[in-house]
UniProtKB/Swiss-Prot annotation:
Cofactor(s) required for function per UniProt: a divalent metal cation
Protein name, entry field: Putative 4-hydroxy-4-methyl-2-oxoglutarate aldolase
Cross-referenced CDD domains: RraA_family
Subunit relationships: Homotrimer.
The UniProt record lists the keyword Glycosyltransferase: no
Enzymatic reactions: 4-hydroxy-4-methyl-2-oxoglutarate = 2 pyruvate; oxaloacetate + H(+) = pyruvate + CO2
Cysteines joined through disulfide linkages: none
GO molecular function (one): ribonuclease inhibitor activity
Protein role: Catalyzes the aldol cleavage of 4-hydroxy-4-methyl-2-oxoglutarate (HMG) into 2 molecules of pyruvate. Also contains a secondary oxaloacetate (OAA) decarboxylase activity due to the common pyruvate enolate transition state formed following C-C bond cleavage in the retro-aldol and decarboxylation reactions.
Amino acids binding substrate: G76, D77, M78, L79, R98
Residues reported to bind a divalent metal cation: D99
Length: 163
């Protein structure tokens, strides 16, 4: 597991990175995480999130555009534990999560807007690996995202921590 400091990455790569608007909170057991972007666009339906965390995710971060909904949780403890077991670096969720006490103990990075106790409907509706835009930034599959307690940044290519 790599440790990333977004302020240092911003200082080292000012022309490469885009800074996501500061609206996310860190809920995961990892203080920092980063990797190649895999995207999901969905609204109050986490069917695609469930499908993706079942797959191997080494070196990848699942970026979920949940439309900013504050009415349903797109991630809970069971899916977070599956994501960690399958090697995902983390998730950035433009929406809510639940089971926050368990997720805080899970070896997974999780950034989200808030917590909400209600689960989603499972209708199988959503899009996988499409460009998604929220918080002032467009997230494209195959680009890179890095997150820590300071914020979330996006880069078109992988970044190395400065020496």
């Amino acid at each position: 597991m790599n440790h990333y400091l977004t302020p240092d990455l911003c200082d080292a790569y000012p022309d490469l990175v885009q800074v996501v608007e500061p609206m996310f909170s860190n809920f995961g057991g990892r203080d920092s995480f980063g990797g190649e972007i895999v995207t999901i666009k969905c609204f109050e339906d986490n069917s695609l999130v469930k499908e993706q965390v079942e797959l191997k995710g080494q070196g990848k971060v699942l970026v979920v555009d949940g439309g900013g909904s504050l009415r349903r949780a797109l991630l809970g403890d069971m899916l977070a534990e599956k994501a960690a077991k399958n090697g995902w670096e983390g998730l950035v969720i433009y929406g809510c999560i639940r089971d926050v006490d368990v997720i805080a103990q899970t070896d997974l990075g999780v950034q989200a807007l808030a917590s909400h106790p209600m689960k989603t409907d499972k209708r199988g509706i959503g899009d996988l690996n499409v460009a998604v835009t929220f918080a002032g930034v467009t997230f494209r599959p195959g680009e890179y995202v890095y997150a820590d307690n300071n914020g979330v940044i996006v880069s078109p290519s992988p970044l190395k921590m400065p020496e």
